[in-house]
């Protein structure tokens, strides 16, 4: 029984490491971040909805399923600030319309008040919470496009 529990514990640690590796692979590294930007601890989400979704994802888990892992990168420069939210779900994400409605409301697209852009692929959701024109957002989008083909 003791060996079985050790085996199960090892599997859980291994699977948690694999999940975090997926997000780590698509996050911007310090070498990829332009010099004028710095990583910060403070959230720079542009809308309350994006911030709430990241901080309390279990609030909506009955709709979109359980989250395996989540991470956020917060950036600021003299000209720009924003956050990239990374959410990884246990199963393929099938609630894209719900997330769009939650973030954008009736417009179903980015607005001045809710400028976030949303990317969904399999079980991963990425939300860029920046103003519409952002060098860092475009850099991240290109990396994710390459990494998640």
Task: State where each predicted segment sits.
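N-terminal hydrophobic targeting signals that begin at the initiator methionine
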Residues: 1-2, 24
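Short, functional N-terminal and low-complexity linear motifs
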Residues: 3, 62-67, 107-111
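Intrinsically disordered, low-complexity regions enriched in Ser/Pro/Gly/Gln/His and often acidic
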Residues: 66-68, 97, 121
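Secretory pathway targeting signatures of secreted, lumenal, and periplasmic proteins
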Residues: 38-80
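Sec-dependent N-terminal signal peptides
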Residues: 4-14
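A short, solvent-exposed beta-edge/loop patch
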Residues: 21-33, 74-90, 99-149
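Sec/Tat signal peptide C-region and signal peptidase I cleavage site
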Residues: 16-20
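Primarily extracytoplasmic ectodomains and periplasmic/lumenal surface modules that are beta-strand-rich
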Residues: 92-94
């Amino acid at each position: 029984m003791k060996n079985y529990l050790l085996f199960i514990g090892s599997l859980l640690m291994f699977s948690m490491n694999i999940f975090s590796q997926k997000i780590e692979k698509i996050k911007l590294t310090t070498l990829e971040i332009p010099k004028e930007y710095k990583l910060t601890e403070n959230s720079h989400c542009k809308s309350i909805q994006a911030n709430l979704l990241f901080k309390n994802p279990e609030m909506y888990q009955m709709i979109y399923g359980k989250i395996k892992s989540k991470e956020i990168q917060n950036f600021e420069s003299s000209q720009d600030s924003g956050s990239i939210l990374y959410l990884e779900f246990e199963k393929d994400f099938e609630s894209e319309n719900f997330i769009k409605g939650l973030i954008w409301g009736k417009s179903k697209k980015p607005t001045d008040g809710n400028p976030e852009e949303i990317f969904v692929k399999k079980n991963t959701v990425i939300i860029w919470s920046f103003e519409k024109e952002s060098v860092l957002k475009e850099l991240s989008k290109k990396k994710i496009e390459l990494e998640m083909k």
